[in-house]
Amino acid sequence: MKKVGKFSSFLTKYIGVIIICFSVIAFFWRDGFAWTTSYTSVFLGVAMFGMGLTIKMDDFKRVFSRPKEILIGFVAQYTIMPVIAWILCQLMQLPTDLALGVILVGCCPGGTASNVIAYIAGGDVALSVGMTITSTLAAPIVTPLLVYVLAGTWVEVSFWAMVISVVKVVLVPVLLGILINWVWGKQIQKISEILPLISVVSIVMIISGIVAVNAEKILSCGLLVLGVVMLHNLCGMGIGLGAAKILHIEYDKATAIAIEVGMQNSGLAISLATANFVANPLATLPGAIFSVWHNISGSLFAGIRRSGEQTKEAYQEVTE
């Protein structure tokens, strides 16, 4: 079990590299991964179930014990990224499918990998977990509503169909995982080290399938999507960090907020595009590329934030 736990930790730490490797393999060996697109919602549900299994009742206590930071993170999550997505789509004059995909990414809750990145960065992990929980539990209403408002100029959006999709692939699996952890907490604790493995494998399968199916399209518009995705992610982290500074939030908490804002549950964006926008097949592409990029940028950002006390002291001088 210890070896499996170490293997799970290794995969979680280097998920960005692993996603890139499997994406390259899927690009050239398309038949080996194309089948996974039929099970996108299943894989995401499994990943969210794995996340639910890691959430304890104490995590909810932390949420209520620090409402200010949680509220700031929540508002930043669901305003900064959606607005940036809409602005980029307008400025870059993106085709309908790609614009829809970018907006879907922007309107999703924080990604599960953000907690790991916050830990590596020396950020406030408890705050990161609290923000992920609140944004995820609110996603069944907030995400469809934002997509309906922002993407309605490009395509017809069925609000209630999206609500049902998010409930099925996010809310139900997460709540089921929380319930099982609450009832059988001691047993779950024994396998806690391998739980991230569930999410890693699921996300890798989702992205590999999207790459395999859209390999030809990636050649024609991949650089455009990559550029938009990079701007989206970096602007999100930068503005999130800037907002935290303006509000005089402590260094480690600001780090967690910036990471949480910039890193999205892009797997959900892919799932929603697959289930609700069949007529727009390329809408899955921004989510797939975002999944690769935000793990790379998140790791680099984590290294910068953890670089030393001088950075922290300089930050404190600015915020005081």
Language model features with spans:
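Alpha-helical transmembrane segments of multi-pass small-molecule/ion transporters
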Residues: 1-320
